[in-house]
């Protein structure tokens, strides 16, 4: 496990002395709930009007309490059968001990608890209803040690029952398990796909596991592109950090968003992720309440997002070109109808590709549905002096620093190596080369004057823009059955896009 800092014996002594001194001088405060509003923030609810203000304050609760502000204390003791609720988005830190018995200890949606020992809790996750004829998926995770079986009591099963869906991903077979067909319990450390036609609040009741946890990954080579696909969830009752790149599910659309390890972004409680194992020996991952490390000399990345042109704000897919070491993340397509933007390295498709420096970077793109798409390209955390997008099909050369959005028509027949990102103005990309590379004779198009080892693809279209032929340049092309007329040849290499007209008689 990677450590965020090193603690030497001398530091241990210093820390111990500090803790002893702080605890010795800590004040005891009692929550009486005098006003009846139950609010922690209201000083009138505290004995003598004294709210706890120190990180080692000893707090006794003598009435039901609502934590409506961020709190950092030493101990928390329930003096009766009282309840505690941490409101949505608020944080409760208890540095030493909690004595709460079996009484309700509730964390509302995205509330956080930082406490290193096990504690019996109820943790809530708010679910927004999906619209008619569509599913707004949620990638959810259980933050308690015990298995949670979906029921009407914990909000998973609603009325009418048919309007919710819950799936578990089986890493062994790369297949989905439908809860309605094969019921299952939610396990700590795993993530699940959930949607509901009604607004609902899921409740996870059980015992917390502290502030860090290890989760195990699996790898099954026989599953092809999904060999290392693992649905892993935040197992902690607080925002947590992972020690690798991962995917989250967009809150606005059914798309998965790649998050680079170097960004040190946190994952909300009750939220799932998708991870990729690189092989049989890559079999564990760590979650922690604090970052595992901070990148020195962070270099940023270029983000590429794709959306349908009719709704450019609704991101359908995304890829990152990272300039930080160790951010690589294998490409996973979760939804069959989504477009796919990605990089390829050593025959492996990547959602995040780490590079030291680059002059030109091929960018691949595929669609499952013909239509108009908008690609948005934006450097983040990095000053870029020159960045152009080259469309290998149309020959367009776009300065994305001036025009970050590029709208284009895509077909399922287009070759995947459609785009290039160019970072050097003198790279020498020629949109059209005058030198002919092909000729037609007796029903055959002959390709010559080409270094075929550098060729990405050959595409031939008719004057109506229909793709007649597409493939790698491996020889000559037969025109048997083609309609006589003018055809456009587009030859894409790693450095050029060459175009030529040919008349077939």
Predicted regions and their residues:
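N-terminal exported-region signature
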Residues: 34-62, 66-68, 72-73, 77-297, ...
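Short, compositionally biased serine/threonine- and acidic-rich segments at solvent-exposed termini, linkers
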Residues: 396-428
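Hydrophobic beta-strand segments within beta-rich accessory/binding domains
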Residues: 149, 287, 370-379, 445-448
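Proteolytic processing hotspots in large secreted/extracellular or virion-associated proteins
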Residues: 27, 347-383
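Bacterial Sec-dependent N-terminal signal peptides
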Residues: 1-30, 426
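C-terminal outer-membrane/trafficking sorting elements
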Residues: 359, 364-367, 433-505
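Extracellular Ig-like/FN3 beta-sandwich strand-entry sites
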Residues: 370, 414-416, 484-486
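Edge strands and adjacent loops of beta-rich recognition modules
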Residues: 258, 328-360
């Amino acid at each position: 496990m990677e450590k965020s800092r090193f603690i030497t014996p001398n530091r241990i002594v210093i820390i111990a002395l500090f803790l002893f001194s702080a605890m010795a001088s800590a004040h005891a405060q009692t929550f009486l709930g005098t006003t009846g509003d139950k609010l922690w923030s209201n000083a009138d609810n505290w004995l003598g009007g004294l709210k706890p203000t120190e990180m080692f304050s000893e707090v006794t609760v003598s009435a039901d309490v609502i934590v409506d502000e961020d709190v950092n204390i030493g101990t928390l003791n329930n003096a009766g059968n009282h309840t505690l609720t941490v409101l949505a988005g608020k944080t409760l830190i208890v540095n030493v001990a909690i004595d709460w018995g079996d009484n309700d200890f509730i964390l509302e949606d995205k509330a956080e608890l930082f406490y290193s020992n096990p504690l019996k809790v109820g943790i809530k996750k708010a679910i927004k209803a999906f619209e008619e004829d569509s599913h707004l998926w949620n990638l959810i995770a259980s933050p308690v040690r015990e298995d949670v079986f979906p029921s009407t009591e914990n909000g998973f099963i609603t009325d009418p029952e048919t309007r919710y869906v819950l799936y578990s991903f089986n890493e062994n077979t790369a297949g989905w398990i439908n809860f309605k067909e094969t019921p299952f319990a939610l396990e700590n450390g795993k993530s699940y796909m959930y949607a509901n036609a009604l607004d609902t609040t899921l409740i996870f009741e059980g015992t917390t596991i502290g502030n860090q946890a290890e989760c195990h990954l699996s790898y099954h080579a026989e599953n092809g592109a999904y060999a290392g696909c693992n649905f892993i969830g935040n197992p902690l009752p607080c925002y947590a950090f992972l020690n690798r790149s991962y995917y989250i599910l967009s809150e606005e659309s059914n798309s998965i968003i790649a998050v680079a390890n170097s960004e040190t972004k946190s994952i909300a409680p009750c939220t799932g992720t998708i991870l990729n194992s690189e092989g049989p020996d890559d079999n564990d991952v760590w979650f922690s309440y604090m970052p595992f490390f901070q990148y020195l000399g962070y270099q940023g990345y270029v983000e590429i997002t794709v959306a349908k042109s009719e709704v450019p704000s609704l991101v359908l897919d995304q890829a990152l070109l990272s300039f930080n070491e160790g951010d690589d993340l294998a490409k996973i397509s979760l939804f069959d109808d989504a477009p796919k933007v990605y990089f390829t390295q050593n025959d492996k498709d990547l959602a995040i590709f780490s590079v030291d420096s680059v002059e030109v970077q091929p960018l691949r793109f595929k669609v499952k549905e013909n239509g108009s798409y908008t690609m948005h390209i934006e450097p983040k955390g990095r000053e870029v002096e020159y960045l152009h997008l080259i469309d290998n099909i149309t020959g367009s050369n776009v300065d994305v620093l001036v025009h970050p959005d590029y709208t284009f028509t895509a077909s399922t027949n287009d070759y995947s190596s459609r785009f290039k990102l160019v970072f050097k103005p003198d790279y020498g990309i020629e949109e059209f080369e005058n030198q002919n590379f092909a000729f037609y004779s007796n029903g055959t198009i002959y390709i010559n004057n080409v270094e075929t080892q550098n060729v990405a693809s050959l595409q031939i279209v008719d004057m109506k823009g229909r793709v007649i032929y597409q493939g790698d340049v491996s020889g000559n092309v037969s025109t048997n059955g083609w309609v006589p007329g003018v055809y456009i040849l587009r030859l894409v290499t790693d450095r050029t896009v060459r175009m030529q007209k040919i008349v077939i008689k």
